[in-house]
Structures are given as structure tokens and as C-alpha cells.
């Protein structure tokens, strides 16, 4: 069952496999009542369900998969639940973005709320996430409390760590979530204002959530750094992380 929020589109995929490996196309048999389904013209299995304005409740539609010679599958049903969010936050710059639902969920949980300007909220999805920002979000997601009244973190670049981030950084260091890195002169620094890569974020979040280890033998072949492979495998197994495109880019 898919879930989304009022006035927020959700992206998903049709589920079908052709035993002969033929390309499949998809056709809607019964349209949804509370929203519309949009399918890309490239023939992929992805679709977008967009609720009608201010609609909430349960919805559904049925579809079939058709192979290259016209054989049709049995009808399948997609169920959707449109919920009213427990927050007034929706993002003006996330309309139509597949991550809009997740962004609202972060606001619901108090993990991250974007900037409010002129009465509208902006998530800034193209902005890089810094190390300091991600430490705070990961700790909030894991339900970890930050230390209070922290003036110094212990890192050599403490002066460049924002005041708001110091309790999180210090707590993360104490809990073993972060270790810092060596600067050119051999000092241990945190670099709070630098963008965090997806691989670094995976290791930090895996430690915060204390996910049970799974097999990570195949990830070295997928361009994932050895030091991040175990964490990436753990989070991918839990459905927290997608490994498409590797983990080297900034988050």
C-alpha cells in the first residue's frame, strides 16, 4: 500500500516480471477516484500518483502488464492512502519532487524543517547537506539526545563549528558516531561546514541506528568504498538507502 500526504504526489513502480525478459508496458484498467496516475512516455515501470486537491482517505486503481506480443497479465491493484500531515509544513520548491513526501515526514518527526520565507517553506533540495547538519538530523532520527551547554567539542577546528552544532558534534564524538579526520598538519578536525558524502552519511547513520550487520560481499564491485560497504549494505537491506549511482557524491 502506498501512502502520501494531502496535495503531495507519490512516485512508485508497477510490479511485473516477464519470464522471457521481454519489455513490458502497463495499462490502467480502473482509474483511481481521488487522484490521477501519470506514466512516463519512456516505457519504464515508474508511475506518479497525484491526489486531487485537498483529497484524503483511501484510493486504488488496477492495471495490467502487456508483453511485446500482446499477452496481458492478470489485473493487479495498487492501494493508496492519502493522509493529512501532522504538520503545516509543505514545501513550495518540492512540488512534483519524488522526495516531497519524505521531506514532510522529516518535518513531522522534528528531524528537519526547511526555511520559512514570506509565509512559504523551502526545502532547498539541491543544496548540499553539511557534516554538522547531518549529524544533528541523524541523532534526532535515532532519538539520541545532545549534550547541553557544550562550548568546546574537542576537535582542532572547534572555532569553525557553529554554536548550534557543537552539542550534536560533541555528543556524536562521545557516542562513537564520528571520529573526525586528519588535517594537513596532523590535527583531528571535523569540518562541520563541509558537504557530507552519501558514503560518510551512511556510516554515521548506521552507527546511530545500530543496524544489525548483513552480508556486504558484493558491494565492493558497485563502486562503494570498502570502509562504507558494511554500513551501505545494512541500510539498503532496511530500505533506508538506495545504492543506485554509488555513494561518492555529496548528499
Predicted regions and their residues:
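Extracellular Ig-like/FN3 beta-sandwich strand-entry sites
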Residues: 9, 56-60
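Low-complexity "stalk/linker" and mucin-like segments enriched in Ser/Thr/Pro/Ala/Gly
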Residues: 27-45, 112-115
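C-terminal edge beta-strand
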Residues: 70-84
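Feature responds to low-complexity, polar/acidic, surface-exposed segments characteristic
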Residues: 1-2, 81-100, 113-135, 139-167, ...
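Extracellular ectodomain surface segments
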Residues: 1-31
Amino acid at each position: 500500500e502506498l501512502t502520501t500526504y494531502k496535495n503531495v504526489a507519490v512516485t512508485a513502480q508497477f510490479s511485473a516480471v516477464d519470464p522471457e525478459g521481454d519489455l513490458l508496458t502497463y495499462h490502467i484498467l480502473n482509474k483511481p477516484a481521488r487522484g490521477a496516475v501519470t506514466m512516463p512516455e519512456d516505457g519504464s515501470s515508474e508511475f506518479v500518483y497525484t491526489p486531487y486537491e485537498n483529497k484524503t482517505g483511501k484510493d486504488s486503481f488496477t492495471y495490467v502488464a502487456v508483453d511485446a506480443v500482446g499477452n496481458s497479465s492478470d489485473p493487479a491493484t495498487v492501494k493508496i492512502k492519502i493522509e493529512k500531515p501532522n504538520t503545516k509544513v509543505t514545501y513550495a520548491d518540492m512540488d512534483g519532487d519524488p522526495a516531497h513526501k519524505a521531506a514532510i515526514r522529516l518535518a513531522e518527526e522534528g528531524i528537519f524543517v526547511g526555511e520559512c520565507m514570506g509565509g512559504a517553506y523551502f526545502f532547498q533540495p539541491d543544496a548540499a547537506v553539511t557534516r554538522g547538519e547531518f549529524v544533528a538530523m541523524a541523532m534526532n532520527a535515532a532519538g539520541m539526545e545532545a549534550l547541553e551547554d557544550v562550548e568546546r567539542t574537542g576537535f582542532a577546528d572547534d572555532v569553525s563549528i557553529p554554536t548550534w552544532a557543537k552539542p550534536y558534534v560533541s555528543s556524536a564524538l562521545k557516542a562513537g558516531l564520528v571520529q573526525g579526520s586528519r588535517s594537513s598538519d596532523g590535527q583531528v578536525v571535523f569540518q562541520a561546514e563541509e558537504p557530507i558524502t552519501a558514503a560518510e552519511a551512511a556510516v554515521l547513520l548506521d552507527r546511530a541506528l545500530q543496524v544489525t550487520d548483513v552480508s556486504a560481499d558484493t558491494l565492493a564491485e558497485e563502486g562503494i568504498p570498502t570502509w562504507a560497504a558494511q554500513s551501505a549494505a545494512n541500510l539498503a537491506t532496511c530500505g533506508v538507502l538506495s545504492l543506485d549511482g554509488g555513494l561518492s557524491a555529496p548528499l
